[in-house]
Amino acid sequence: MLMYQVKPGETLESIAADFRTTRQALLQANPGLNGGQVSAGQSIIIPGIRNPDTIPYRIAVSLNGRTLRLYERDRLVKTYPIAVGKILTQTPRGEFVIVNRQPNPGGPFGAYWLSLSKQHYGIHGTNNPSSIGKAVSRGCIRMHNRDVLELASIVPNGTRVSITP
């Protein structure tokens, strides 16, 4: 199970939304929560998400470099070109985990969707391959379909994703 440190301004409801779970599931996993109140710096259990420290893979996204790097332990496995958010809808920076996945999600998301632990954001394919390498998305990380399919076949849910400028 994932141990999560509450950030300033977060509530149990916002954490539940980010991790695609319910307030009730969080309360059941954390019986010591007083009335469901959380405070910044507090550690809580996120049920159903594997601990990233038990996963040999991690993903490092460079927004300025427009690259996604896949590591196995500390060894670089592969670097993929990506598209990122445009100025008005920037890709969020920070530490996230993959919380769920959906093959063939429909719409503009290409062949695969990997949800990040921030509601409405993910790593996905594209129906517009010429967009790769540009700042054109609404904040998601966009990959060539063949690349997102390859990535999804390697990394499990719970994989750590670091997004830096």
Curated annotation (Swiss-Prot):
Listed InterPro entries = LD-transpeptidase, LD_TPept_cat_dom, LysM_dom, LysM_dom_sf, Transpep_catalytic_dom
Q: What class of enzyme is it?
A: transferase
Catalytic residues, chain numbering = H124, C140
The metabolic or biological pathway listed in the UniProt record of this protein is: Cell wall biogenesis; peptidoglycan biosynthesis
Q: Report if keyword Cell division is assigned.
A: no
The record's section on SUPFAM superfamilies has: L,D-transpeptidase catalytic domain-like, LysM domain
GO cellular-component terms in the record?
extracellular region; spore wall
Compartments where found: Spore wall
Q: Where is the L,D-TPase catalytic domain?
A: 57-164
* GO biological process terms held by the UniProt record: cell wall organization; peptidoglycan-protein cross-linking; regulation of cell shape; sporulation resulting in formation of a cellular spore
Q: Please list the GO terms describing molecular function.
A: glycosyltransferase activity; peptidoglycan L,D-transpeptidase activity
**Keyword presence, Transferase:** yes
Q: Where is the LysM domain?
A: 2-46
Give TM segment ranges.
Answer: none
Q: Where does the source fall among the domains of life? A: Bacteria
- EC number(s) on file: 2.-.-.-
Q: Into which family does the record put it?
A: Belongs to the YkuD family.
Free-text note on domains in this protein's UniProt record: LysM domains are thought to be involved in peptidoglycan binding.
Assembly, in brief, is: Monomer.
- UniProt cross-references to PANTHER family, sorted A to Z: L,D-TRANSPEPTIDASE, L,D-TRANSPEPTIDASE ERFK_SRFK-RELATED
The free-text function statement in the UniProt record for this protein reads:
Probable enzyme that may play an important role in cell wall biology.
Tell me the protein's name.
Putative L,D-transpeptidase YkuD
What organism does the record attribute this protein to?
Answer: Bacillus licheniformis (strain ATCC 14580 / DSM 13 / JCM 2505 / CCUG 7422 / NBRC 12200 / NCIMB 9375 / NCTC 10341 / NRRL NRS-1264 / Gibson 46)
Task: Output the lineage of the source organism.
Answer: Bacteria, Bacillati, Bacillota, Bacilli, Bacillales
